[in-house]
């Protein structure tokens, strides 16, 4: 079972207003960047693997010509796999963002899977239980077991926290 602290490995870049819930695991070479005036808030038990980039960037409002801040909220029990990229994208609970998947200015609801190398178009909402496949194909997983997913994430965090050279822990 994982501890209640977030584990941040060495060689991780965390900048700006970033908050973590309990039991998160941030692998080496991940980048979590909240630009000035923006923020990123993680829930509990999120796994962020190597090379993942999660950014909150201010956006230019064409009407006012002002830059507006962005607040990203990432729920609980999400797994961001190697090289995935999210920018100004909110994520609900129990999702798998697979290898080198990309989402910009989007919204990912709960219990979804983004397959490897997929890209959500800007402004798109990935609906609950969706499985997003290459070539913009979409199917739905109505048999997703949230309890099993949560248990698997907790077990994985428990294993990983002993495998990495942890630079810091945060309560």
What do these predicted ranges mean?
Residues 3, 25-26, 74, 91:
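Generic signal for short, ordered secondary-structure residues
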């Amino acid at each position: 079972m994982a501890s209640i602290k977030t584990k941040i490995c060495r060689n991780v870049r965390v900048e700006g207003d970033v908050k973590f819930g309990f039991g998160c695991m941030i692998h080496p070479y991940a980048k979590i960047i909240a630009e000035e005036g923006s923020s990123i808030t993680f829930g509990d038990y999120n796994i962020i693997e190597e090379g993942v980039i999660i950014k909150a960037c201010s956006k230019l409002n064409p009407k006012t010509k002002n830059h507006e801040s962005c607040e990203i909220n990432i729920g609980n029990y999400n797994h961001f796999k190697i090289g995935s990229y999210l920018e100004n994208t909110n994520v609900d609970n129990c999702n798998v963002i697979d290898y080198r998947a990309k989402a910009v200015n989007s919204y990912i609801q709960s219990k979804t899977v983004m397959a490897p190398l997929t890209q959500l178009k800007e402004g798109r909402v990935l609906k609950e239980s969706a499985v997003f496949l290459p070539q913009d194909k979409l199917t739905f997983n109505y048999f997703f077991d949230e309890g099993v997913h949560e248990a698997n994430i907790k077990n994985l965090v428990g294993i990983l926290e002993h495998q990495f050279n942890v630079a810091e822990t945060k309560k």
